[in-house]
């Protein structure tokens, strides 16, 4: 028998984890942290439970009389939809049960909501409970966006200053897309970006999109061109350029815009290209830094993409207030770099 090695042999690929539950994925992720107390695992599982409960509400919205407006306005000056209120109260109720979350900043609340003064409550959560609520009555996909931070120190409770930190301090971020099926996409930054599809027959999220990676360049752009009269000249020049006919450079790009941030960003994450909600001429953006821009920036960078205001990296921006608004550009790295070059006047 020959003792010569077979140089053509290669070790088998790591087995796919497609089909594992969200709970199993979270538990496996903690195996590399021997000192883990279980608090982070429990908090992420609570967010998964919120997604299940809101899914149930969304599915029965028309029958349960929770479509339409409450007549109230939130801190953003937006008329509150009934489902917005339901989603927000569901999240606060679930996160307040186990004492792992010290406080929450929500789009629906003017101020920080303190949930626990126990020093063992190490985490704080930022959330848009139901993004795209203007689409609720017309049955277009909507979503939940969240981010998790560690509390600044072991003091008894949290205060608003705990939240005024750059997105690079996030320890987890994700979103839930309520569409033809419910999909939860989550990352802890280090282990990649993974998507879990909800199976209502067994009440579990199962891994369906493993290690999502955004393409280096895409072929679509997502922007509300109805606002073009309000854009700065550099954004208008970029918008005209991306629609020019140049086959060698892969242009024109196709337009894809729903008007629901979670839906538009999700498609961009999977297919590549660029999503942009630029500043108007005054320099003001529309999307909230803490619970919209930063979580998506954290997700896109973990998937190999880029996220920018057009002038600076989103994850480096320090919030000045809980509900600060910023411009947001997300997408394939080369597409975002093209946009930034126009903003800098290099094109």
From Swiss-Prot:
Catalyzed reaction equations: beta-D-fructose 1,6-bisphosphate + H2O = beta-D-fructose 6-phosphate + phosphate
Localisation per UniProt entry: Cytoplasm
Associated pathway: Carbohydrate biosynthesis; gluconeogenesis
Official protein name in the record: Fructose-1,6-bisphosphatase class 1
Annotated organism of origin: Sorangium cellulosum (strain So ce56) (Polyangium cellulosum (strain So ce56))
Subunit structure: Homotetramer.
Note on cofactor: Binds 2 magnesium ions per subunit.
Enzyme Commission identifier(s): 3.1.3.11
Cofactor(s) needed for function: Mg(2+)
Key word Zinc-finger present: no
GO biological process terms held by the UniProt record: fructose 1,6-bisphosphate metabolic process; fructose 6-phosphate metabolic process; fructose metabolic process; gluconeogenesis; sucrose biosynthetic process
Cross-referenced InterPro entries: FBPase_C_dom, FBPase_class-1, FBPase_N, FBPtase
GO molecular function term, any single one: fructose 1,6-bisphosphate 1-phosphatase activity
One cellular component (GO) term of this entry: cytosol
